Amino acid sequence: MESRVIVDAFFRENSLVKHHIDSYDDFVENKIQGIIDEVTGVETEIKGGYKVSFGKVRVTKPINKEADGSVKEITPMEARIRNLAYSAPLYLEMIPLIGEGDEEKTLSPIEVYIGELPVMLGAKICHLSGKSEEDMINYGEDPKDPLGYFIVNGSEKAVVAQEDLIPNRILCEKVEKNNKIVDIAKVFSTRHGFRALCTVERSPDGLLNVSFPGMPSTIPLVILMRALGAESDREIMELISDEPTVVMQLVANLQEAREEHGINTTEDALEHIGKRVAPGQPKEYKLKRAETILCNYLLPHMGIESEKLGAKCKYLGRMAKNSIELYLGSRVEDDKDHYANKRLKLAGDLMEDLFRHSFNQLIKDIKYQLERQAIRNKEPSIQAAVRSDVLTERMRHAMATGNWVGGRTGVSQLLDRTSYLATVSQLRRVVSPLSRSQPHFEARDLHATQWGKICPSETPEGPNCGLVKNLAVMCKVTTDEEDEGIIQLIKEIGLSKDI
C-alpha cells in the first residue's frame, strides 16, 4: 500500500507526457525569441533605404476570431467540436529604419500580429494548465487525460519524438570503400537548425582528407589547416599530436601539400580552396569566397566569426588524431547504438525546426510586399506587408500532414484513442530515422545502455521492429541547453577553455 502512495506521488509531479510539455514550454519561453534574434531583420532594395529590425515576441493564450470579427478565448473541447485549430496569436515588435548610412533614422516600434502558433494541451499557455480535476470536468475534459498533444482543424495530433545521432561530438568508425577500409572521424556540426556533416578520412595510402558542405569535393587536411592559420609543418603536427606513432603518419600528408600542390602559406591554401569554390573568378573574390565557406560551413557549431578559425583548426587536429589512432588500433570504433551517442528531438525541438523554416518564409514575403509597395509609389507599411497566413498555414499544414522540415514524414500523427494505454503509448513513442526496408540488425537490437530509458518489450512486430520504441515508464528527458550560456558560466567561475 505504501509503495502505491509513492508511485502516485511520483506521477503527480512527473506526468507521463512531462517530457513533451517541458520541451514545448522551453520552445515558447526561449526558442521562439532565439530564432527571431538569429535574424538581422528585413533588408529591402527600396531606394533611399528601408529596413526592419525585430524586437521582442509576445505569445498570448489561445483565442479564436469569429465570423462577426469578435475575438474570444477558445477551449480545447470547443476546437474539437467546431473543427478549429487550438492556437495562440503571435505578436512581434518591429522597428522600421529609414535612410542610409549616417542619415539612417529609427522610427517608433510597432507590435504586429504575425500568425498563429499551435498550442500543446497542458503547456503553460494552454487554458488547462494547472487546473484541478473539477476544473477539467468543467472545461469538458477527462481529468485523467494525459494531454501533451495538439488540436489542428478539430483533429487531435500527437508529435512523435525523433531519435538522432548526437550533434557536435566526434564519432569514429571504419567504413568499406572500393573494397578497402577507410578510417573516419565525423561530427554532425549543428547550429541554429543548420546541420553540417564534417568528416576527416584516412585513406588506405595514409592520406588525410576532409569533406564538409560548401566544398565540391574532399580537400587534403594539411591544406585546410594551412588555410585556417597553421602555416608551418611543426604547428600542424603540434595541433594534431606529439605521439611519435601518430606524427609518422603525417609525413606523407605534409609532403603531398608541398610537393604535389605547392602550398606553403595560408594565402596559397585559401587560393587553392577559392579555385574550387569560385573557379574563373578574380583572386580577391576567390580569397573572400574561401574565407566565407570556412566561416559558415566548416564546423558551424564552433561559431561563424573569422576569429573562430584558429579554434576550428585545433578541432580538425583532434579529428585527425582520432582517425589515425583508429587506424593504429589505439582507439576503438564508437558504438552508434550506445544511448550516450543518441539524442531525442521532442515536441519543442521539432516545433523549433518548423517555426524557424516558417519564420524565414515570412521574412522573404515581408521583403517582397514592402518592395512591391515601393514600386507602386506607396508609403511602406509594415502592417500591410505582414501576411500572417504565411506563418500560420505553413505550421498548420505540417501539423496536419506530418510532413516536416528536412523531408521527414509521419512526425505528427492522429492521436490513437483506441484505449487509454494506446494514447499514452503513442505520446511516449520514440522513432528512429533509419530505413524500414534495410536490415540494420545492430540498430534494431536491444542495447544494454537502454536500461531504464527505453522499454525492452514494447516495440511492434514486422519492419518497424526495434526502430519504433517507447520510453520506459519512469524515464525522464531533460531539455537541451545552449552552449554559449554554459561557456559563459565556466568563464565566470574562473575555468579556462582552450577551444
Swiss-Prot record:
It catalyses: RNA(n) + a ribonucleoside 5'-triphosphate = RNA(n+1) + diphosphate. GO terms for molecular function: DNA binding; DNA-directed RNA polymerase activity; ribonucleoside binding. It is found in: Cytoplasm. One of its GO terms (biological process) is DNA-templated transcription. The keyword Transcription applies. Its EC number is 2.7.7.6. Keywords: Cytoplasm, DNA-binding, DNA-directed RNA polymerase, Nucleotidyltransferase, Transcription, Transferase. The keyword Mitochondrion does not apply. GO terms for cellular component: cytoplasm; DNA-directed RNA polymerase complex. Belongs to the RNA polymerase beta chain family. DNA-dependent RNA polymerase (RNAP) catalyzes the transcription of DNA into RNA using the four ribonucleoside triphosphates as substrates. The Rpo2 subunit (Rpo2N and Rpo2C in this organism) is implicated in DNA promoter recognition and in nucleotide binding. NCBIfam families: PRK09606.1. Part of the RNA polymerase complex. This is DNA-directed RNA polymerase subunit Rpo2N. The gene is rpo2N.
